[in-house]
């Protein structure tokens, strides 16, 4: 399967309030027709927190919002896992944003999901990576990074 690296130019922030929408409405629309979850990884402790849709995407049981990284990795296609781990590494070490489209186990088949993440400063710590993951229906693995200048 082909892999494409994208160069991202900084996008202008799209303010939903400029068209009369609230942030809640934006999230409601994003989640309306697909699984769409939020997550964070504390870089000092490794604590990986996720919302229920992330658990549903990975066909995992949600107990207290703490994602089991070992189980999480078992659900990712073995060809895609090293690239996803590189995304996490580059994001945290170079304070970048990234996106990646990759395959997740669904029964005997694989489905595509997209993860978008970014490094976030957290005072007194090494920071954290925060992001979203949602079902994706294109059939191309891809990864992209920004230069970190916000």
Regions flagged by a language model, labelled:
Residues 49, 86, 123, 139-142:
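Active-site-proximal flexible loops/turns
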Residues 2-16, 55-147:
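PAS-family sensory domains
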Residues 42, 107-109, 139:
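Short, charged helix-to-loop "capping" segments that act as catalytic/coupling loops
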Residues 42, 80, 135:
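Acidic active-site catalytic centers that drive phospho-/nucleotidyl reactions
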Residues 12-22, 81-83:
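Short, positively charged
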Residues 18-73, 112, 118, 144-150:
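PAS-family sensory domain signal
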């Amino acid at each position: 399967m082909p892999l494409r690296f994208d160069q991202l130019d900084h996008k202008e922030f799209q303010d939903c309030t400029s068209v009369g929408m609230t942030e809640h409405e934006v999230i409601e629309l994003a989640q309306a027709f697909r699984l769409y979850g939020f997550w964070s990884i504390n870089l000092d402790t490794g604590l990986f927190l996720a919302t229920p849709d992330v658990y549903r995407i990975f066909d995992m049981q949600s107990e207290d919002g703490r994602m089991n990284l070992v189980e999480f990795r078992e659900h990712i296609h073995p060809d895609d896992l090293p690239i996803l781990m590189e995304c996490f590494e580059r994001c945290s070490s170079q304070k970048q944003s990234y996106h990646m489209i990759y395959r997740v186990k669904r029964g005997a088949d694989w489905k595509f999901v997209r993860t978008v993440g970014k490094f976030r400063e957290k005072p007194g710590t090494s920071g954290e990576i925060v992001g979203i993951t949602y079902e994706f229906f294109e059939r191309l693995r891809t990864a992209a990074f920004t230069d970190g200048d916000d």
